[in-house]
Amino acid sequence: MQLEHLPEEFEMARPVLQTIEQAGYEAYFVGGSVRDTILGKEIHDVDIATSAYPDEIKHLFKRTVDTGIEHGTVMILDHGTGYETTTFRSESTYTDFRRPDQVTFVRSLAEDLKRRDFTINALAMKEDGTVIDLFDGLADLKHRQIRAVGDPQERFHEDALRMMRAVRFASQLNFTIVPETLAAMTSHAELLRKIAVERTQVELLKLLTGQAPQQGLTDLLTTGLWQYCPDFADHKVDLERLTAQLHQGASTDLTAWTLLTTSFGLETNAITTFLKHWKTANQTISAVQMTTKMAQHLLQGSLSTWQVYQCGEDQLMIANEAAVVLGATDRSRELVAQWQNLPIQTKKALAVTGRDLMQAGVQPGPQLGAILGDLEYQVVTGKLPNEKPALVAAVTD
């Protein structure tokens, strides 16, 4: 196969390949950018594989950065955008089920491609658009299926994260995992325990925000991988229910987390524990506590003016999206109108400050904050106008 019209990202990177080839080495575009171009999807960056060793690459270009020199990766900066260029390599055993114990640089493209995870990712492309397909990846793209390169048992024993990548790709691409690969995932599922949670988290979120999350979640359940995701063990029924309800991907990572925590029926403290086990940031935990609480309210009815104010517009939309997936009526227009009609949308918009109240005779201290909080509530709920004289009078009279 030869692609006639290459995306701009490839065109801009052509001089890099040409420079390497003119020096007598091989160089190809590889990986997801090749796959996605064939599928007609947008690409964002390109990766280059070459027979040139890192030191040889550094002699060919004026500006380079060692981004992963021990694995043969050098960033080339000569042509504006940085291009990651990695030497063809073969890999030894993987005693930690994630990273090879030893990397050996080789001159063979075939040796390099056979160590990759799936056939659809083991495609290479020359700078003129000619696709090199040594493992029938083009056929698997045509049939919309995910197949491990070579022996799937070996691929997943080498790197257990590949199993999560498989279910992620099933969702992102709306592809089916072939039976032999799926069976190997089932027999190796327990190895997911060996993988850092942060790595698993990335794949889970990509699954939940993909175009076909039902496919990815079904594979997660079928293979047993779900059991080795933090705090999923007691929620098989909840996951099965969510799988049946989630017809399209979550719009954001926060929505994805909200779907899980709401489906699992988690309250504030349990959400903290759950998300800490998933190694999420404190800011994410706070946001998900709010969106989950509001999604639970929306599943039971509407939100009060005060709840709308507390949540904020962006988080309201996340809570509504999650609630709709789980069976609630879509209240997005109603919620936006409620938000826009609030007397104030932030505490800073309150017509009085602590200084104003102290000048009116209120003593400083904890009670001052409590008074301001009460005034904020009264204004938001329409019991007091957001006018300085009225608010001062409400405190001093």
Swiss-Prot record:
The lineage of its organism: Bacteria, Bacillati, Bacillota, Bacilli, Lactobacillales. GO terms for molecular function: ATP binding; CCA tRNA nucleotidyltransferase activity; magnesium ion binding; tRNA binding. This is CCA-adding enzyme. InterPro entries: Bact_CCA-adding_enz_type3_sf, CCA-adding_enz_C, CCA-adding_enz_firmicutes, NT_sf, PolA_pol_head_dom, PolyA_RNA-bd. Keywords: ATP-binding, Magnesium, Metal-binding, Nucleotide-binding, Nucleotidyltransferase, RNA repair, RNA-binding, Transferase, tRNA processing. Its cofactor is Mg(2+). CTP binds at G32, R35, R116, D159, R162, R165, R168. The gene is cca. Mg(2+) binds at D45, D47. A single active site specifically recognizes both ATP and CTP and is responsible for their addition.
